[in-house]
Amino acid sequence: MAKRVESPTSINTFKQCKRKYYYQYIEKRPTLSNIHQVRGTIAHSSLEDFFDISLENLTEDNYAQTFRENIQMIFLKHWKDNKKTLDYLGLNNDQEMFYFEETMLMLMNWLNQFIENLEKTVKEKSIDVKEAFNYLKPIREQEYKSEEYWVRGYIDAIHEIENEIHLIDYKTNSSFEFEDSIKLQLAIYSLLYFEKHGKRPSKVGIFFLRHKLKLMKVDEGLLELAKKEINLLHSHTTSSDHIDSYPKCVGPLCKWSTGKCDFFDVCKPFEK
């Protein structure tokens, strides 16, 4: 069987449950949207667009208020643009308002920390707020694709800070931990960056929008982790496309109090 171009998401799905991987990436069964995915997309788009705001009327006196007004307008636009998708989820008005306000608070939390960094940059480098804004502006939403490893991914933000390269992903989930799935995602991003640019990024991390930025150093071990997991997946998927080669992993991620796996009904994990 030919190799598929994989992603951090598909590789983590394979590690979580091979049967789920089979349904999603081999049979290509449709998956359902949920509020966490939709609001995550809205938050990502809002942060990406924030760095395109006009700086023409920005001054030392109004920058904080200008930033807050802009990110709220950008967020509101993206929320409205996704209204059809949000309506499809079937949330009642109170539920939708809860997620709207919660996501806005996450963005304001990020912005408050950005303003702190901007003020620190103004002071340390003796530059004005416009120059500091552009200094802190990352390269955004870059696609990287490996011809050698048949894997690709989108990096939310690439920062060059004092001759160091930092790769950042934004997450709206409540955890503030580097779970194994997150560590693998960051390892794959590091490998993709290394293959394209010929050097390792200095650090990779997650900006947990409920909390703050959390970084880890990139070393050879992190790149080797990515290579190992990518190769294990390709070795498995190129040897068989038969459903029996993709066993179920029955557990709490099959069904929980507020939802179930997208493939629960076809998989029937608890039936013998």
For every predicted segment, state its role.
Residues 18-31, 86, 164-170, 233-244:
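Short amphipathic alpha-helical segments and their helix-coil junctions
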Residues 46-140:
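A non-catalytic, helix-rich entry segment at domain boundaries
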Residues 31-34, 175-179, 215-216:
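A generic structural signal for short coil/turn motifs at secondary-structure boundaries
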Residues 35, 39, 99, 103, ...:
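Hydrophobic (often cysteine-bearing) scaffold residues that line and stabilize catalytic clefts
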Residues 5-6, 119, 150, 180, ...:
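Metal-dependent nuclease catalytic regions and adjoining charged, substrate-binding loops involved
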Residues 42-45, 184-192:
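Short amphipathic alpha-helical face segments that pack within enzyme cores
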Residues 127-188:
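Non-catalytic protein-protein interaction segments used by genome-maintenance enzymes to assemble
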Residues 1-70:
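Charged, glycine-rich intrinsically disordered N-terminal tails and low-complexity linkers that flank
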